[in-house]
Design a protein with these regions (language model features):
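Helix-loop interface residues and adjacent transmembrane-helix termini in multi-pass membrane transporters
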Residues: 35-38, 135, 161-163, 234-237, ...
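Transmembrane helical elements of multi-pass membrane transporters/channels
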Residues: 10-25, 148-152, 168-190, 199-266, ...
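Hydrophobic alpha-helical transmembrane segments
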Residues: 113-116, 142-192, 359-363, 377-402
Length: 410
């Protein structure tokens, strides 16, 4: 199979797996909202937001690095080993930060511990996906996404039926943890089959990638997660619950770019070696394709939301419809930004990408604060996030097609 054909196959399989995991996450929130109410849904989605936000401080970038630079080759295996060691202490630190953050947001001891556990589990899940992608084990990712997604839903139903509401996050913790464990075990087995004399991993290039990729991910993804926390802090629990339902419906589309991007990182690395004209043609074609797919998906979702949302969550959540429709604009820009940021990082232009996304995030945050003063935290979160993501996607698209000097990684 050609490199392009392999990339397409990997993208399709990656998307299938992430759709399965995204569907299980969506079903998770629907079950919580339907059976436990808006207040518990708001708390649950806020916990997910905190976990994902903290994972942007290294684990997500480590997963991307494992996908881009890992593999079964000698240097790739050593790179994965170095990243795994980094993840051990990094996840411990982020778990402690999550514990404190959850407490500051009003969580009790048990709920704060669950948020910390979710942060650690999610961080290893994201890293495990990257390890699998780096070793070209994309079919395994799809299989385990399906298995662990189903496992988390079964456990969630069991938790609710046994009236153990304080443990509502435990099924997600177990599901993500099981995926991560399977990924690391699979990677270890693959490494044993390719034993050879070790040599130092490219630590300078790896550190550069981790730092700038993390900054770029925070700037790009952070505003989406901050919006949930913002709505929970600056609006009533009921309104925050409506925003949580809206965000739950908007999230699956955003996962498309997140699913495709890791599988394309090796292809991005190859594009970085091409002449500018060829590279620009490749990214232009890929960006146009993704834009059409995302635009069509967003339009369909916006059209069906007025009747679909009340059916899914119940009539009590009908007020979330305009919030969800507004968030679809944000998700459209977010998905393009994730894709383009990963491309720019892979070709050595992470700094200018981070500057663009960071500026967009700051502008969006200011708009979010201003709009919330008169319209409330939930509406302010929608307006601010949408503004940030559209500005980010526009700037990144312009940068991606602009002749630029490749940044040094030394």
């Amino acid at each position: 199979m050609t490199d392009s054909g392999s990339a397409v196959r990997d993208s399709v399989l990656s998307t299938i797996g992430t759709i399965a995991q995204g569907a299980s996450r969506f079903a998770y929130t629907v079950i919580v909202g339907r059976l436990l109410g808006a207040d518990v849904l708001a708390a649950t989605n806020t916990a997910f937001a905190v976990s994902i936000l903290l994972s942007l401080l290294g684990p997500t970038a480590a997963g991307n690095a494992a996908a881009a630079f890992g593999g079964t080759g000698q240097t790739g295996r050593l790179t994965t080993k170095a990243l795994t060691i980094t993840m051990v202490w990094l996840s411990a630190i982020l778990g402690a930060v999550a514990l404190v953050t959850a407490h500051l947001l009003g969580g009790g001891g048990a709920s704060s511990l669950m948020v910390a556990a979710l942060t650690v589990s999610w961080s290893w899940y994201i890293f495990g996906r990257g390890v699998r992608f780096g070793m070209r084990q994309v079919p395994a990712v799809a299989v385990w996404d399906n298995v662990t997604g189903a496992l988390s839903l079964v456990l969630l139903v069991a938790v609710i039926l046994t009236h153990m509401t304080p443990l509502v996050l435990a099924p997600a913790v177990i599901g993500y943890g099981a995926f991560a464990l399977a990924s690391l075990v699979g990677a270890r087995r693959a490494a044993r089959r390719h034993d050879s004399e070790e040599r130092p991993a490219p630590t300078q290039a790896l550190a550069h990638f981790l730092i700038w990729s993390s900054l770029g991910l925070i700037a790009t993804n952070g505003i989406m997660q901050v919006s949930m926390v913002f709505a929970a802090v600056f609006d009533s629990p009921a309104r925050a619950g409506l925003f949580a339902a809206a965000l739950s419906l908007a999230t699956p589309l955003s996962m498309l770019a997140q699913a495709v991007t890791p599988a394309l990182l090796p292809q991005f690395a190859q594009w970085s070696q091409l002449p500018h004209a060829d590279r620009a043609r490749s990214i232009r074609r890929a960006t146009l394709t993704l834009t059409v797919l995302l635009g069509a998906g967003a339009a369909v979702v916006i059209a069906v939301l007025p009747w679909a949302l009340p059916i899914v969550f119940g009539q009590d959540f009908a007020g979330a419809v305009p919030l969800a429709q507004g968030l679809m604009v944000a998700v459209f820009g977010f998905s393009l930004s994730v894709f383009l940021s990963a491309y720019l990082a892979a070709i050595g232009r992470a700094r200018i990408s981070t500057l663009a996304t960071g500026t967009s995030a700051l502008v969006g945050l200011m708009i979010m604060i201003g709009a919330s003063i008169g319209l409330g935290g939930a509406v302010g979160a929608v307006i601010g996030t949408g503004s940030a993501m559209i500005l980010s996607a526009s700037l990144l698209a312009a940068i991606s097609l602009w002749p630029g000097r490749k940044e040094s990684v030394r």
